């Protein structure tokens, strides 16, 4: 086993002391047992727990074969999905690939350009994307459990027409891959009738926990990332975080500290990175925790920040604003690439004190200085150390945060595996759009909006 993630809690003191962590150990162990025995709320959606060792090997092989077909056939790969249907794959691709992978020549990239659609309803975004890709060879992966989620359904209708006009129905079906329910739903019906290759979203894995299913694995594999290594990282994390000893289990310690802080009025957690390629990992994490914990009038509000960039916008608030914040820093110990700062004889910028130092060294000192400054200002800091950004450690990070999320939700007394609140805006939107069956509601809403 490679080196694992490690947790540094020294800068959560004096806000949380060790005896408070120990006090929560038995409760956390009980919540973990509830997860393992599948006796708690939402227990029909716990397939993610054993997924790293219990995935469908035949389908996994088909994913790798389809990814090779996509790489060999297409200039552009369009991933259509919203929420958990795209955030995980985008987080992995952006974390591990070249920062500017879409701008590289294909001879350097060796994989298609990858663009994401169906995660908004912006006509400008869609028109610009169509303009960009219309003259290129295109493959599409549409990801939806039901096939009727508004944003991806609209996007797929548009791209399906584009591909059929460009390649004919027979040609289009060779370039469309559908990830959907095993047996039911509009997308399953369409995929079966059109003859698309399909991959299954497991019934027992919710969308925000689905990155290690075909939902995430096909786009990730098509980007050239080693999904075997990713599953290995998740499997090793599953084994490591099976310990019921809070001294050894970093998931337990993370859950204990964040919940102890929450009980003391620290109601906002900021996931902070110092690597721009982790931006979408923060977006994935926000959905994971926001949908899992935010219900019944409770929950830690998940925010994410990209430092040092956001220190020049949010830094003032974090340092001296309302004291309801704590931070979780992702500290990448070894960067993918290094670049040295050279000496300048004139030294007009006064930076020669950094000459012959690596930019990553400067970045790490910025992280260390920020942790200390924010701690002095009343903001506790959890530091999660990650040896490197690779497929293996992406798998580790995913499992770490997913397991912590499940335990933490139970600790807060909520069902972390449902999301009833997301239906409210949809009902209003459908009524305002005139969807059949919503006529009475439409009139009421229009009156309220006057």
From Swiss-Prot:
What pathway, per the record? Carbohydrate biosynthesis; gluconeogenesis; Carbohydrate degradation; glycolysis; D-glyceraldehyde 3-phosphate and glycerone phosphate from D-glucose: step 2/4
Q: Which residues form the active site?
A: 291 (proton donor), 312, 426
> What's in the keyword line of the UniProt record?
Cytoplasm, Gluconeogenesis, Glycolysis, Isomerase
User: What does the record give as EC number?
Assistant: 5.3.1.9
Q: Where in the cell is it found?
A: Cytoplasm
The source's domain of life comes to Bacteria
State whether keyword Cytoplasm applies: yes
Sample GO molecular function, one term: glucose-6-phosphate isomerase activity
| A Pfam family of this chain | PGI
| Reactions listed under catalytic activity | alpha-D-glucose 6-phosphate = beta-D-fructose 6-phosphate
Q: What class of enzyme is it?
A: isomerase
According to the UniProt record, one GO cellular component term is: cytosol
Keyword Cytoplasm annotated: yes
BP term (GO), one:
glucose 6-phosphate metabolic process
Chain's role: Catalyzes the reversible isomerization of glucose-6-phosphate to fructose-6-phosphate.
> What's this protein's family per the entry?
Belongs to the GPI family.
Q: What is this protein called?
A: Glucose-6-phosphate isomerase
């Amino acid at each position: 086993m490679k080196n694992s993630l490690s947790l540094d809690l020294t800068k959560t003191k004096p806000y949380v002391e060790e005896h408070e962590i120990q006090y929560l150990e038995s409760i956390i162990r009980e919540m973990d047992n509830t997860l393992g025995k599948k006796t708690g709320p939402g227990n029909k959606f716990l397939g993610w727990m054993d997924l790293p060792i219990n995935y469908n090997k035949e389908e996994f092989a088909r994913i790798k074969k389809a990814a090779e077909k996509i790489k060999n056939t297409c200039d552009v790969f369009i991933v259509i999905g919203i929420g958990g249907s795209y955030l995980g794959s985008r987080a992995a691709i952006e974390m591990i690939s070249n920062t500017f992978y879409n701008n590289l020549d294909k001879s350097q990239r060796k994989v298609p350009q990858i663009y994401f659609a169906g995660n908004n309803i912006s006509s400008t975004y869609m028109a610009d994307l169509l303009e960009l890709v219309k003259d290129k060879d295109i493959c599409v992966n549409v990801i939806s459990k039901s096939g009727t989620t508004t944003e991806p359904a609209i996007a797929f209708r548009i791209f399906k027409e584009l591909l059929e006009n460009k390649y004919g129905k027979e040609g289009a079906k060779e370039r469309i891959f559908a990830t959907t329910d095993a047996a039911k739903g509009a997308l399953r019906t369409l995929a079966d009738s059109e003859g698309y290759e399909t991959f299954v979203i497991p019934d027992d894995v919710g969308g925000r926990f689905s990155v290690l299913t075909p939902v995430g694995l096909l786009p990730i594999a098509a980007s050239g990332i080693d999904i075997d290594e990713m599953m290995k990282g998740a499997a090793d994390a599953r084994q490591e975080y099976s310990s019921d000893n809070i001294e050894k289990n970093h998931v337990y310690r993370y859950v204990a500290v964040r919940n102890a802080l929450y009980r003391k009025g620290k109601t906002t957690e900021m996931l902070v990175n110092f690597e721009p390629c982790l931006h979408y990992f923060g977006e994935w994490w926000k959905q994971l925790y926001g949908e899992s914990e935010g219900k019944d009038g409770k929950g830690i509000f998940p925010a994410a920040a990209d430092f040092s960039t956001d220190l020049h916008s949010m830094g003032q608030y974090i340092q001296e604003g309302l004291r309801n914040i704590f931070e979780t820093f992702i500290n990448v110990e070894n960067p993918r690439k290094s670049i040295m700062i050279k000496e300048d004889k004139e030294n007009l910028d006064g930076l020669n004190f950094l000459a012959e130092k690596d930019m990553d060294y400067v970045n790490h000192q910025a992280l260390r200085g920020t942790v200390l400054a924010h701690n002095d200002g009343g903001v506790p800091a959890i530091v999660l150390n990650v040896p490197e950004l690779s497929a293996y450690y992406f798998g580790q990070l995913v499992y770490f945060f997913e397991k912590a999320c499940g335990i933490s939700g139970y600790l807060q007394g909520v069902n972390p595996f449902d999301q009833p609140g997301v239906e409210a805006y949809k009902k209003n939107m459908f009524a305002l759009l005139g969807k059949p069956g919503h006529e009475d509601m439409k009139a009421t809403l229009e009156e309220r909006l006057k």
